[in-house]
A protein has these predicted regions:
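Rhodanese-like catalytic fold shared by cysteine-dependent sulfurtransferases
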Residues: 1-49, 57-62, 70-99, 105-200
Length: 200
């Protein structure tokens, strides 16, 4: 995932949190400086590849939540995910023994939902910062280096295994391409459409 995508999502999350800092109430008070520290240290999100490992390994307590509208969820969703559209998040119930992972198409709504849940006191909540774009780029169709070093072999083998597990196909980079490309070539909607055509 690119640094630009992380910074954009982080800025959005803090922008959503700012009104809580100005006029806190017992129901919505939130420690914005603490949130800012979490965002700065990347404690607010989890990489898509890590979430893929947790799904594959059936990590206890994992609760994967898709905050997109139901019609989008019904077209494509991550394995084991439940649909809680963002407007229904305030009424949802969560327990302390759950690890809640939020995602949306590109990450913006998941970041907003993360702020809402932090304001509500949910402890173990994170989001996939790049949303489905990261899932398609990093899990289903990871870009593999053309000439991997010996030290990369184990990581690449795992990426290939995860891609196959979830029905994807890795992409092979041309020489020099892996270092130059950190953004998808097309929009998220196109990636999703292509994956649907491939049956993912």
């Amino acid at each position: 995932m690119s640094g630009t995508r992380i910074l954009g999502t982080a800025a959005l999350a803090l922008g959503v949190a700012a009104p809580f800092a100005e006029a806190p109430t017992p129901a919505s008070a939130i420690d914005v400086p603490a949130l800012a520290r979490m965002v700065a240290s990347r404690q607010d999100h989890v990489p898509a590849v890590e979430v893929a490992r947790w799904i594959r390994d059936r990590r206890p307590g994992l609760r994967l939540i898709d905050v997109r509208p139901q019609e989008e969820f019904s077209q494509f969703a991550l394995p084991t995910a439940e649909n809680l559209p963002i407007e229904s998040i305030p009424g949802a119930r969560f327990s302390d023994d759950e690890i809640v992972i939020l995602y949306s198409e590109g990450g913006a709504h998941a970041a907003q939902a993360w702020v809402f849940l932090k304001a509500a006191g949910v402890r173990n909540v994170y989001f996939i910062a790049g949303g489905l774009a990261d899932w398609f780029d990093d899990v289903l169709h990871p870009l593999l280096p053309p000439e991997p070093s010996a030290g990369e072999a184990e990581r690449i083998a795992e990426l290939v295994e995860l891609s196959a597990y979830f029905g994807g196909t890795p992409r092979e980079a041309a020489p020099g391409e892996a270092a130059a490309r950190d953004e998808p070539e097309s929009g998220t909607a196109a990636l999703i459409a292509n994956a649907r055509r491939r049956g993912c």
